[in-house]
Swiss-Prot record:
<protein>
    <recommendedName>
        <fullName>DNA-directed RNA polymerase subunit gamma</fullName>
        <ecNumber>2.7.7.6</ecNumber>
    </recommendedName>
</protein>
<dbReference type="InterPro" id="IPR007080">
    <property type="entry name" value="RNA_pol_Rpb1_1"/>
</dbReference>
<keyword id="KW-0862">Zinc</keyword>
<feature type="binding site">
    <location>
        <position position="92"/>
    </location>
    <ligand>
        <name>Zn(2+)</name>
    </ligand>
</feature>
<dbReference type="InterPro" id="IPR045867">
    <property type="entry name" value="DNA-dir_RpoC_beta_prime"/>
</dbReference>
<feature type="binding site">
    <location>
        <position position="473"/>
    </location>
    <ligand>
        <name>Mg(2+)</name>
    </ligand>
</feature>
<dbReference type="InterPro" id="IPR006592">
    <property type="entry name" value="RNA_pol_N"/>
</dbReference>
<feature type="binding site">
    <location>
        <position position="475"/>
    </location>
    <ligand>
        <name>Mg(2+)</name>
    </ligand>
</feature>
<keyword id="KW-0548">Nucleotidyltransferase</keyword>
<feature type="binding site">
    <location>
        <position position="74"/>
    </location>
    <ligand>
        <name>Zn(2+)</name>
    </ligand>
</feature>
<dbReference type="Pfam" id="PF04997">
    <property type="entry name" value="RNA_pol_Rpb1_1"/>
</dbReference>
<keyword id="KW-0479">Metal-binding</keyword>
<dbReference type="GO" id="GO:0008270">
    <property type="term" value="F:zinc ion binding"/>
</dbReference>
<dbReference type="InterPro" id="IPR044893">
    <property type="entry name" value="RNA_pol_Rpb1_clamp_domain"/>
</dbReference>
<comment type="function">
    <text>DNA-dependent RNA polymerase catalyzes the transcription of DNA into RNA using the four ribonucleoside triphosphates as substrates.</text>
</comment>
<keyword id="KW-0804">Transcription</keyword>
<keyword id="KW-0808">Transferase</keyword>
Amino acid sequence: MTNSNLRTENHFDYVKITLASPDRVMEWGQRTLPNGQVVGEVTKPETINYRTLKPEMDGLFCEKIFGPSKDWECHCGKYKRVRHRGIVCERCGVEVTESRVRRHRMGFIKLAAPVSHVWYLKGIPSYVAILLDMPLRDVEQIVYFNCYVVLDPGDHKELKYKQLLTEDEWLEIEDEIYAEDSTIENEPIVGIGAEALKQLLEDLNLAEVAEQLREDISSSKGQKRAKLIKRLRVIDNFIATNARPEWMVLDAIPVIPPDLRPMVQLDGGRFATSDLNDLYRRVINRNNRLARLQEILAPEIIVRNEKRMLQEAVDALIDNGRRGRTVVGANNRPLKSLSDIIEGKQGRFRQNLLGKRVDYSGRSVIVVGPKLKMHQCGLPKEMAIELFQPFVIHRLIRQNIVNNIKAAKKLIQRADDEVMQVLQEVIEGHPILLNRAPTLHRLGIQAFEPKLVAGRAIQLHPLVCPAFNADFDGDQMAVHVPLAIEAQTEARMLMLASNNILSPATGDPIITPSQDMVLGSYYLTAIKPGASVPEFGDQSRTYAGLEDVIHAFEDKRLLLHDWVWVRFNGEVEDEDEIDKPLKAESLSDGTRIEQWTYRRDRFDEDGALISRYILTTVGRVVMNYTIIDAVAAA
């Protein structure tokens, strides 16, 4: 489409990341203007003119290459307004279009000498070293101009293909070759730097090497076999993606759009600029100097030193600090390279692409909510009113409490009781999603029924903590509101915490008591050493039921670890119970009493149980009563 206001939609199945060929790099940056002029190459290290504050031509912010810095206005000001759309100014060569093109138009730097891509050279594993079947140290010696490499041994008997030679060794061989009595006709060819590396990679016939490797693998064992498989895997990937190994050596470097590496003016006339501009400037300066030295036929040692410096400048641009000394700025801070911008938590992917802010979401610290049910969470009122505001406004209008949205918002700001009542109705049965970063498995996001709570912290049931890998030492969690009925249904059916009891990885229960719960359960049921055991019938320590013990404990007449006799007609299991009762007594009314270590039973004439009193602690009564109460409620 010619109209730049219209956005085209491209439907695609997948995104593939492969090595870019030199032609592809040029394609990204090179454009043919409507007047037939080809632009795209950045040749000057300048950014902006400090008097006019306009971008320098052919520099890192050039308007001819990247587009105008002001909407519908060329560099020299001859053409202004949208009516000149698409015209290329004959004076300055800038196309009249929108300034936002400076966010996606790229340029390129044509290098005076090839340079190796530091990711493939110094990455782990080093793909260059694997492909060439050479040690990484040797490859580095070649790239950084420390050693020559034999590209063609010719007729020389002592030289081998890919053999490394020091400067002195090569000088000796040269003297031997050019001696008057030399019998060598085909002279050996050696190379140094990324040019030699490129030649070695160009000489690789991937299909033949892959075939040979397959034969070698079938007859190899152990470490050698593993090494061959590793090399074959890399070669197969190159073949499958139609990429050439020599593309790991760069002839041109893409220059990213200027609005992605901006330069802004601060108060007082100073400028703040992206670190990338400094790194690009180093590359351009060294590249231009190398081109000039090659033009004037400078001595080989000077040219070689300049090529090494260019290699180091490109390394710093792509991944500063990966090799050699880290390039630092004015205040001794390492400059952020392209890799630093992409990788890590603050990188482009995790921060900007995967970590986008979304509507109807919030974030707060989590605290324990022991009184919640497992499928519930405590949502602060302040957060709930903000998250569910559209639902609250809709209900306020529908119930004729207010007439319009503006009045509803005023009512919400005052936090009237009516609003809280409506909010309570809205959240009833509306699940919310809780997420704790990092979300390493599907249980990192679960659905809960919200309960309004005071304060500003989200309350979480302690049993769901293992699934989130959460604890209450300052962890934060994000809240998301599913809006559509389908999303709410899915959250309730599939994501509710009470439906996710087993770990999807192992099948073992992930809802297990831990930490505070285990300690609390132990403390509640522990027996205090030396605590006095009352005789049966002691009025202050004998109770008719579990509730009476609970009431006595709440009234502070009993302590948690006090022994009590309590009537309990349920089943009692005790591993320490002896086979026979300690004491058995028949009464005159025909009933029989049996005294055991921890219980006292009374039976009628037919042997049916009339009453049972058990000896236990107050804490154990509390525990038992709580479990019975929870089971009955379920």
